[in-house]
Amino acid sequence: MFKQSVFIKSAANKSGWIEDNIPEVCFVGRSNVGKSSFINTLANNKKLAKVANTPGKTRLLNFFDINNSSFRLVDAPGYGYAKISNSMKVEFGIMMEDYLTTRENLKLVCMLVDLRHKPTNDDVQMYDFLKANDIPVLMIGTKLDKLKRNEIAKNEKLIKETLEFDQNDVFVKVSNLDKINIKESYDALIRLLEVENG
């Protein structure tokens, strides 16, 4: 769990990015995957990443200082929400591609997928994009508590097959509600970021 976490700023484009050498981990996932809840659980702060009432509402990159500048967490807008305009989807695509391909601070992407469902085309495209650009990925399967015991392995297999998951990447199944594997996901994040733990 994060020892310290504080919101710094939001940015719509490169001009708003923070200029320093602090490593960043970017959290991505489709709308309603449980990204804000996962961030809040890691931070042990229910209000850190505001859980938007309307999926796809936040169209900015939100920057958070973690563990007294040990690293930064960058919360990206949820993707795949049908009710936003095509122009907003294009803006989102440009913003994300710019950040993911040119941001030197970016050391890791934490991609969240819903364990209950087969990955969407948006999920597949995001994972393919990350792999094509050699961006390290930590995959988090959310909503573990919503699955029956006999569904867990089957659903994980379906997700990995659909994404053509790289076995060198780490996959952690979590429940924000029951706090299952939160420490394991944090430990994996710290290990992959190669930063000091606190």
Swiss-Prot record:
Keywords: Cell cycle, Cell division, GTP-binding, Magnesium, Metal-binding, Nucleotide-binding, Septation. Residues 21-195 form the EngB-type G domain. Pfam families: MMR_HSR1 (PF01926). GO terms for cellular component: cytosol. Its cofactor is Mg(2+). PROSITE patterns: G_ENGB. One of its GO terms (molecular function) is GTP binding. The keyword Cell division applies. NCBIfam families: GTPase_YsxC, small_GTP. Belongs to the TRAFAC class TrmE-Era-EngA-EngB-Septin-like GTPase superfamily. EngB GTPase family. HAMAP family: GTPase_EngB. Necessary for normal cell division and for the maintenance of normal septation. This is Probable GTP-binding protein EngB. It comes from Mesoplasma florum (strain ATCC 33453 / NBRC 100688 / NCTC 11704 / L1) (Acholeplasma florum).
